[in-house]
Amino acid sequence: MSARLVDDLPRPSGVPGLRVWLKSSGYARRLLLGEAGDPWESAPRFLSFFTQAHGLLRPDVAVVDVGDLYRSWVARHPALKAEMAAKSRVAFPLRRMLEEEGPRKLLTEVVEAVAASLRGQTPLVLALPAPRRWLTEAAGFAGRTAVTVDTDAVESAALYMADFVRVVGALPIGGLLLEEDEAASDGDLEATRPLVNVARHYRWGLALRGQAAAGSDELDSLIGAAPVAGGDLAQGLDVSQELWSGAPVAELGAGQFYFAEIPEGAEPESVLQQLSRLRA
């Protein structure tokens, strides 16, 4: 395994690579810290949490969930919520949130600590909500229950996010994962150009969990429930639903790997059994 995500991705040409990518922060938090536990209170606390979770689950990708960082920070700093609500522009809450110095400093400390613990053996990936999704979430933090997000707002969000991730540009990050939701639009990937440019500048791999159409050639990996034909794109088969329902899981083809989100309330014995299915 390598510190760079692109070096570890399988390719349709037959080049082997990683096999199991997990989204496990909610499950690991409940299991290791309890229902109310928060690993983001400090960098040492997060490192302890991360090393325990990583040792238990042994994923092929080490993920730091930046969305979780900000959910924790906003919950612990109510004054920031008020500042995020100060202006009516749809992108302002996200802009104000990402400008906050405290989370930037904490993320830098966490990435430094986690990267040192990995020692270049596993790619370190920052997982972020995709711009449209993060706009909506930040608006919710600011008390806005309904917002209309157009392509211009998505482009603005991508600019703010690109500026934000530069804070860790000098650190050994292997890639970025953008996670969409059901509100994603066909033009969203093209609107994320600032993030694409930053990823290319720092030689980070770029993965998307969602449904990409136009612009998918900008990605190194696309993660979804159904494979996409053509190209040299590494494809993550999202088997979360099948895995935890006990349904059969598709065999991997060339250039494919498994992606699974572990339910927060899953039983540890069941989790280890199901992960064994993916690794068999």
Task: List the model feature ranges, each with a label.
Residues 74-167:
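Active-site-proximal, glycine-rich beta->alpha crossover segments in alpha/beta enzymes
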Residues 24-26, 66, 126-130, 180, ...:
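A cross-domain feature marking catalytic cores of carbohydrate-active enzymes
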Residues 6-9, 47-54, 107-115, 162-165, ...:
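Generic structural signal for well-ordered alpha-helices
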Residues 14-18, 56-61, 119-124, 172-174, ...:
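Short, well-ordered coil/turn segments that N-cap beta-strands
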Residues 42-43, 61-102, 175-186:
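Glycine-rich, proline-tolerant flexible connector loops at the mouths of alpha/beta enzymes
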Residues 149, 162-225:
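A contiguous, surface-oriented mixed alpha/beta subdomain in the mid-to-C-terminal portion of proteins
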Residues 209-280:
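Catalytic-face loop-and-helix region of soluble metabolic enzyme cores
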Residues 1-71, 257-280:
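N-terminal basic, low-complexity leaders that serve as flexible interaction/assembly modules and, when applicable
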